[in-house]
Amino acid sequence: MNYCSSCLNVDTRPNSNFPKKNLCSACDYYFKTKNVNYEERIIILNNIVKKFPKNPKRRYDCIIGVSGGKDSTRQALWIRDKLNLRPLLVCLGYPPEKSNNIGPHNLSNLINLGFDVHCIYYSPKQWKDLARYCFRNFGNYLRHSEQAIVSAVPRLAIKYKIPVIFWGENPGDVLGDSKTQGKTGYDGNNVKF
């Protein structure tokens, strides 16, 4: 068993790895981003946003995939209030087996804050059929819901002609799960089926 030299996390945690100098991937990410010039990144982000001027014929300027977690609320507020964009929020409604009361409460809060939230739900039968299929074929009965949110956001962006998509953080970098890491961050490279 190996330990992270910074946080003492162990390599026996599922999907963990220690890419550099006995650091877990979460600590490695922390040290990589410690000296990031966020003021420069804000300028870059603002320049990207300027490439997609507001269009009065379009109801939304951007789209954000949200889960109902605290990060979703922060991200939506920041994009609306700091970047002055009109976002459409997209959420995959999870079945009772995978949700608690906090997510729906936070989504209600987003609606009360003036956001439009597009929720996508499976029928109970469809959810069970997909869960069974994913368990048998991938060993992960929730894989269908993980892939659904990654595909739903771009599909709705195309459908409603929304030019900008905002994604949240990469859980592999932030939480240390190497199975979710893509080539350039959380870019969908692990979505294979």
Predicted regions: what is each one?
Residues N2-F193:
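ATP-dependent adenylation/nucleotidyltransferase module used to activate substrates
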